[in-house]
Design a protein with these regions (language model features):
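Extended active-site and interfacial segments that coordinate phosphate-rich ligands
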Residues: 80-89, 94-99, 369-400, 408-432, ...
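Short active-site loop/helix that positions an aromatic residue
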Residues: 58-60, 69, 119-129, 143-147, ...
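Acidic beta-strand-to-loop metal/phosphate-binding motif
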Residues: 51, 110-118, 401-403
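A common structural junction motif
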Residues: 494-496, 602-610
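Conserved beta-strand -> loop -> alpha-helix junction used to position metal-binding or nucleic-acid-contacting
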Residues: 131-148, 156-158, 430-434
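Conserved "right-hand" nucleotidyltransferase catalytic core of DNA-directed polymerases
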Residues: 1-87, 107, 133, 159-167, ...
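Short, basic/hydrophobic alpha-helical segments
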Residues: 39-43, 93-110
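Conserved catalytic core of nucleic-acid polymerases
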Residues: 187, 241, 349-357, 361-364, ...
Length: 628
């Protein structure tokens, strides 16, 4: 790290650190002596609620250093504990033993612990020798459950302004803005300025709990938060800190091969086109396809507008000209190289040799987890090249990769929610649900269902869960509109419970202005009666999908919580590493593989009790691709 004087020289003296105030009515108290620390411990022991926050040198909990910790035990006062970082680790000013005393006091406290974006703070503390095992109330996750469309205003400062009327100090006033190339570390800011800022963060979190809890109760979100979201936080902390192993030599070889193939494909595109153009430019590609080569698609467009060059449109043209499959391959190779093959090595943490993705609980409206830096939930599986990327995800030395994938979880949730007797019976008999659906709508014995019939039934099964219309079915399968209408009619005649549930859900959306998942996660809909028909239809599709996808996401999260507890209680060294929608990946020592296989199957299939059985498929191999 550069010397501090060199960093400070970037600022004029008058603008070095901003003003010495937090913008909040919080009295800061700094722990500087053993007497101060003892008083803080007494307050923790007698507190009903404790809010905490960490100050760090960065925003990546797997790499940053801790600068300090703030705590509030009653409104209006915030304690700040500066941290000293040494070669041996870290310690509070009064000595390293104090950190253990503080950790013990928090974990044995009968108080509610609260934090804003708790996953980050718990992860930072764990990395610095303070594992918080006490349940933690996360005000950010609570706010997201209350209003899933407030994603841009989930930060502590906006919420304090909204709920408390505070105009809090922004961190940029202390460390500068990264976009201006003038940002320093929080470690370099004087204690007299850090303390009030940090104390206010803890105090704001403390007081936000009261502001949010009334809404949590009014909206019936207690089960969602206390049984699903809050217990999941330490599981995600473990997964992020553990990371996933990457086969770097394999990626290096794959990069050379894919890069060579990419160049060859681009040269072939230019040869077929008869000229060089920018394949990555939608405008230039559209001009080549639709004007120069004269390809036509079945859409209406203004004379001056070019049809789309998005993937779904190009797929429709795949057999119309030899340039189209080449363009699709070029796109896939370029994306895989830029997003994974060449990007993953740069994301490997040099201290651990692993990639540490970030799992996000407050992004997807239905409650599904998302991941970022890198996004491991979009690694392709349905193409040869995509599966080759998956081959780079491996176990630790001596370990294997275990994948447990829920079988048709969203359709099982649909059968449960709709209480459809025919669909439930098919699952309870263990039938191939897509073949069973095909037999029902095509009026043929189950044994005589053809692969094509099963494929159509599969599309409608999954499409129903996403609110698909007969028009969409026709577009996605090549059916005529009349055939699609008849197919849907036959489907709903057989599965009348599904039709009834769809209609009830749509009416609820219009009447109540929201729909909810099994554990109460709501998706609100603003007054729909005055909206255009197209907007109402789109809202109906979202309303149908939300309880299905959201409930499935809750089941997966509960399974993750159960698997983690069972692994810990059993003393296993196996670690969960990646979650992709309805699939869990684990890094398993080979000597534990038999026991862990059965443990994971049991915990996933018994995660919740539905009117249909939950089933999971287990695979093991040397890498992610090999488990299938």
């Amino acid at each position: 790290m550069p010397e501090i004087p060199e960093q400070l020289s970037m600022f004029e003296p008058s603008e070095s650190y901003g003003e010495a105030h937090s913008g909040a009515p919080t009295v800061p108290r700094i722990v500087q002596t053993s007497v101060d620390f003892a008083e803080l411990l007494r307050e923790i022991d007698s507190a009903d609620r404790i809010a905490f926050d960490t100050e760090t040198t960065g925003v990546d909990m797997t790499r940053c250093d801790m600068v300090g910790m703030s705590l509030t035990t009653h409104a209006g006062v915030g304690w700040y504990l500066p941290v000293e970082v040494t070669d041996e680790g870290w310690r509070l000013p009064a000595g390293s033993a104090d950190a253990l005393l503080l950790c013990d006091a928090l974990n044995r406290s009968r108080a509610m612990l609260a934090a804003h974006n708790a996953k980050f703070d718990i992860g930072v503390l764990r990395r610095h020798g303070m594992p918080i095992t006490h349940p933690v109330y996360d005000t950010m996750i609570a706010q997201f459950a209350i209003d899933p469309f407030a994603r841009g205003a989930l930060g502590l400062k906006p919420l304090a302004r909204q709920h408390l009327g505070w105009d809090m100090q922004e961190i940029e006033s202390l460390i500068g803005r990264s976009s201006a190339g003038r940002q320093r570390s929080m470690r370099d800011v004087p204690l007299a300025l850090v303390a009030p800022y940090a104390a206010a963060d803890a105090d704001a979190t403390f007081q936000l709990v009261d502001a949010l809890q009334s809404q949590v109760h009014a909206l019936g979100l207690e089960r969602l938060l206390y049984e699903v979201e809050f217990p999941l936080i330490p599981v995600l902390v473990d997964m992020e800190l553990d990371g996933v192993a990457i086969d770097l030599p394999y990626l290096a070889a794959l990069s050379k091969e894919m890069t060579a193939r990419l160049h060859a494909v681009e040269l072939e595109i230019y040869r077929v086109a008869g000229r060089i153009f920018n394949v990555a430019s939608p405008q230039q590609l559209g001009n080549m396809l639709y004007r120069v080569l004269g390809l036509q698609v079945d859409i209406s467009a203004d004379a001056d507008e070019l049809p789309s060059t998005r993937a779904h449109r190009l797929e429709e043209l795949r057999d119309k000209h030899p340039i189209v499959p080449l363009v699709l391959e070029q796109r896939e190779l370029a994306k895989l190289l830029g997003t994974y093959v060449d990007a993953l090595p740069a994301l490997v943490n040099p201290a651990t040799g692993r990639v540490h993705t970030h799992f996000n609980q407050a992004v997807v409206v239905t409650g599904r987890l998302s991941s970022s830096n890198p996004n491991l939930q979009n690694v392709p599986i349905n193409s040869v090249n995509g599966r080759r990327v998956r081959r780079a995800f491996i176990g630790a030395p001596g370990n294997c990769v275990l994948s447990s994938d829920y079988s048709q979880i969203e359709l099982r949730v649909l059968a449960h929610l709709a209480d459809d007797a025919v669909l439930r019976a098919a699952f309870q008999r263990g039938e191939d649900i897509h073949a069973s659906t095909a037999a029902a709508v095509y009026h043929v014995p189950l044994a005589q269902v053809t692969p094509e019939q099963r494929s159509f039934a599969k599309r409608i099964n999954f499409g129903i869960a996403y609110g698909m219309s007969s028009y969409s079915l026709a577009r996605s399968t090549g059916m005529t509109d009349e055939q699609a209408d008849q197919f849907m009619a036959d489907y709903f005649k057989r599965f009348s419970g599904v039709r009834r549930w769809l209609n009830v859900t749509k009416r609820q959306m219009m009447r109540d202005g929201f729909v909810a998942t099994m554990y109460g996660r709501r998706r609100p809909f603003t007054e729909m009666r005055s909206r255009p028909t197209s907007e109402v239809r789109r809202a109906e599709r979202l309303a149908v999908n939300h309880p299905v996808q959201g409930s499935a996401a809750e089941i997966v999260k509960i399974a993750m919580i159960r698997v983690q507890k069972a692994l810990r209680d059993g003393g296993f060294q196996t670690r969960q590493t990646v979650q992709v929608h309805d699939e869990l990946l684990l890094d398993v020592p080979r000597e534990e593989s038999h026991d862990v296989r059965e443990l994971v199957r049991r915990e996933m299939e018994e995660a919740v009790r539905l009117s249909v059985p939950l089933k999971s498929g287990i695979g093991m191999g040397d890498n992610w691709d090999a488990v299938k």
